[in-house]
Regions:
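Short beta-strand His + acidic residue motifs that chelate non-heme Fe in jelly-roll/DSBH
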Residues: 48-50, 68-69, 85, 91-97
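Short, acidic/polar N-cap/turn motifs at the starts of alpha helices
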Residues: 25-27, 37, 56, 65, ...
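Conserved short histidine dyad/triad with adjacent acidic residue
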Residues: 23, 38-53
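A generic "binding-loop/recognition-motif" signal
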Residues: 35, 44, 54-55, 73, ...
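Short acidic-glycine-tyrosine-enriched beta hairpin
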Residues: 72-87
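Short, conserved beta-strand element in jelly-roll/cupin
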Residues: 41-43, 53-68
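A short, N-terminal "cap"/entry segment at the start of jelly-roll beta-barrel domains
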Residues: 1-38
């Protein structure tokens, strides 16, 4: 079987365009119907505002550390850890004095 190799755009870092987000840049790596992969880079005092997501999201901390909240419960997030944000539940991600790089994996909720 021959591997299916396709070219993909080489994304540039760009600031997140959402109101309430600051000091965070992102790169979308894959944007398909069933899967979104993005890398986010947080500077000190970076934040993704509190909001409910439309899809289940897994956040993997690749480097550095920060904080996350899910349904108003707060926890630290360090390199080598992940957190799941269920669809429709309010969540937030931020840094204080440190930097952090995360992989964001979003996929639609499967309804039986």
């Amino acid at each position: 079987m021959t591997p299916e190799i396709e070219s993909v755009p080489r994304p540039e870092w760009s600031p997140l365009p959402y109101e309430g987000c600051r000091n965070v840049q992102g790169k979308v790596l894959v944007d398909e119907k069933e899967l979104l992969l993005a890398v986010l880079r947080f500077e000190p005092d970076g934040t993704i505002h509190e909001h409910p997501g439309a899809t289940d999201t897994v956040v993997v901390c690749l480097d550095g550390s920060g904080f996350t909240s899910v349904a108003s419960e707060t926890a630290p997030l360090h390199a080598g850890q992940r957190v799941r944000w269920p669809a429709g539940i309010t969540h937030r991600l931020w840094t204080e004095d440190s930097t952090m790089t995360t992989l964001m994996v979003e996929r639609p909720r499967h309804v039986p």
